[in-house]
Design a protein with these regions (language model features):
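Sec-dependent signal peptide recognition
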Residues: 2-9
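Enrichment for repetitive, rod-forming helical segments
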Residues: 9-11, 143
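N-terminal signal peptide c-region/cleavage motif recognized by signal peptidases
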Residues: 14-16
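A generic "folded-domain core" signal
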Residues: 19-184
Length: 184
């Protein structure tokens, strides 16, 4: 399952036009792995093994400090959903202790199907949404997705230090780009 999720992750981060993906480790914080992709994007990902072999999930967050945008992808093998189209709206919430923060409301998630899994992706456009998402990710205990009244998933985060490293990674790329621009 891990290799299948990593395959979907590679498609998300590299883009269809890339001939070859270059992924370099940046940091490992708890169960979060932070990498640079193609020397231009920073990604943090966490794999969640399921109770049975076909029940694993993953969260992938892509962040650009230059654009102040973030992308969230939830990957699962067997989503409990109606017939899938190209997009579905999920309620995005965060849990802290027993308190559910549902201020994000309904968000459209683009659907990609691979042979062994589904990827549900939402882009937080603009600095306000991107920064707010990272703050909530860092300060809450779990990310929760609902479809209608039913909960799809609740994944533990423990992401405060990982988000700090993700921001550091992205800032270094912006700094390197500025340095490269001065060298030309």
């Amino acid at each position: 399952m891990r290799s299948r999720i990593i395959g979907v992750y590679a498609l998300l981060s590299a883009g269809a036009s890339q001939a070859e993906r270059v992924s370099e480790p940046f940091a490992k914080v708890g169960y979060w792995e932070i990498t640079t992709e193609n020397h231009s994007t920073c990604v943090m990902k966490s794999l969640y093994p399921g109770k049975v072999a076909d029940d694993a999930e993953a969260l992938i967050i892509v962040y650009s400090a230059r654009q102040k945008t973030a992308v969230l992808s939830w990957i699962t093998q067997k989503p409990k959903l109606p017939a899938l189209t190209q997009s579905l709206d999920f309620e995005l919430s965060f849990l802290k202790g027993r308190s559910l923060n549902s201020l994000w409301g309904s968000r459209p998630f683009h659907i990609e199907k691979s042979p062994h899994s589904y990827s549900f992706t939402h882009a937080f456009r603009g600095p306000m949404d991107g920064e707010r998402f990272l703050r909530d990710l860092a300060s809450h205990d779990a990310l929760v997705l609902f479809f209608g009244p039913g909960m799809l998933t609740s994944l533990p985060l423990k992401a405060s230090d990982a988000v700090t490293k993700l921001r550091e990674c992205s800032s270094k790329i912006v700094g390197q780009d500025a340095f490269d621009g001065l060298q030309k």
